[in-house]
Amino acid sequence: MAGRSDIRIAKNTVIIYVRMIVTILVGLVTSRLVLQALGASDVGIYSAVGSAVALVSIISGALTGTTVRFMNIEMGKPDGDLNRMFNVCHTTHLCGAALIFLILETLGIWYIHTQLNVPPGKAGDAMFVFQVSTVVACLNIANVPFQSLFNVHEKFGTIALVDIANTVVKLLLVLALCLFWRESPAGLRIYAVMMSAATWVSFLFYHLASRKYWPDTVRWHPVKGGSAYREVLSFSGYNLLFSSSMIARTQGSNMLINAFFSTTVNAAYFYASTLQNYVMNFVSNFDAASAPQLTQSIGAGDNGQGELLARRVCRVCLLLFLLLFFPLWSELDFLLRLWLGAGIPPDTVVMSRWSLLVAAVSVTSAGLFQLINAYGRIKWFKVESSTLFLLCLPAGYLLYRDGFPAYSILICFVVADILNRIIQFILLRALFRFDVGWFVKGAYLRPALIVLLMCVYIAAYRRLPLEGAWMHLAGFALTFLVCAALVWGIGLSRSERSRLLRHPRVVSFLKRSR
């Protein structure tokens, strides 16, 4: 069973990484074109207004995690009723979408009119972007139960095709923006409408495809009785608390930056966050590919298999992260200027470095997050995480009030994440008798040794006299090869290297390369 599970996870991972590579490459081009077409100020407005929407769309994140978890658990049960669980989640999402719409059209409009710091003459554009973003947020919430079906059935190929198609469409629309509406007074409004088009396409596709593939599951059948929703809503409540703290930490900090600094600093934070998201997506995709297997193992009562899988996922995610982190760190200044061009907002480089450090600490939760959700007893995990994340906002406010630079709040993120991981292990041991030493040794020890060796390498690398674009690109490639060699020789065990070398596709490739 473990072998079949590994094969399915590997297949899902390959599909997800193909999607990720395409979307990141296209996204990098799109980001640069948007900066050229709109300018740093309008990009900052779009980011700040989007933060206001994201801050109140925390319900979406909470309901998404709940839906995927309960559907996977239902799939793992021998007598699971997926149609009943789908209808419970669908009803909950529709109510959540209505609640978000009400919040956005009241408190959100108040924020835009009274608190948002925008250049003169741009208030109307900000309100237009806000209304478009409101519609997009509500559609995304209503779409979650249908998209979750593709996740629990491990139809990652379909999800990948939809995401790739959406990314390519966005690129084509941005090219049209550059050609026909570059530096146009209405450019920001046109861009907002263009970005909403992909959401409408996804919404229609997932609804129609779900009714084609799983008509019995999506068949509308009202589930009566409060008990049917109590467990889902209780789980959602704690996820809601956690999601609100995460959004407050990221998007709320964006609003804090807007209050103390200019919109160009918002743009720098936006691009640093974009880089962090790209790196985290590279890692979290493997985590996502393993989620159905891990959760269904716990649902079937096989806790040992679930914990073993969580430890393995954590180590592999850390190794994948290191393959990106050190090459990026070695040539970050050059790569950001290559990506964004001469119009790169000030402070982007320093914010990006701290964002990478935030990601480095965050990735240590890979596998653990899925395992905790699968266990189901999430109350204290969500409470402690949310408390630490929310404390970052007042800490950032105090730092900004005393004149500290914009990146100071990212330092708060790093400290909060370190404390969060320590408390998570304490809770896991207390609530589930989880063997923390076994997990730490198996998940963190090998990556930690690679980190030490790569830090020595980076210290020596900085002494090299690199001049010209090709020398910097060669240095980036060299750092990647050195890190990859350490991941292969130290990060993977002897049995893992042996299995990879014996894999039929690897053997076939080696024969053809001779």
Language model: regions and residue ranges:
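N-terminal membrane topogenesis motif
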Residues: 1-27, 80-91, 126, 222-243, ...
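Signature of the first transmembrane helix
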Residues: 8-73, 101-105, 136, 171, ...
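Transmembrane helical elements of multi-pass membrane transporters/channels
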Residues: 11-28, 166, 191-210, 225-296, ...
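Interfacial/gating helices of multi-pass transporter permease domains
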Residues: 33-55, 82-85, 125, 188-193, ...
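Membrane-proximal transmembrane or re-entrant/amphipathic helices at the cytosolic face
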Residues: 2, 432-437, 456-514
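Helix-loop junctions and terminal segments of transmembrane helices
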Residues: 61-77, 152, 214-215, 272, ...
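Hydrophobic alpha-helical transmembrane segments
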Residues: 19, 161-213, 273, 386-391, ...
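Interhelical loop/hinge segments that connect adjacent transmembrane helices in multipass membrane
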Residues: 1-9, 188, 204-250, 293, ...
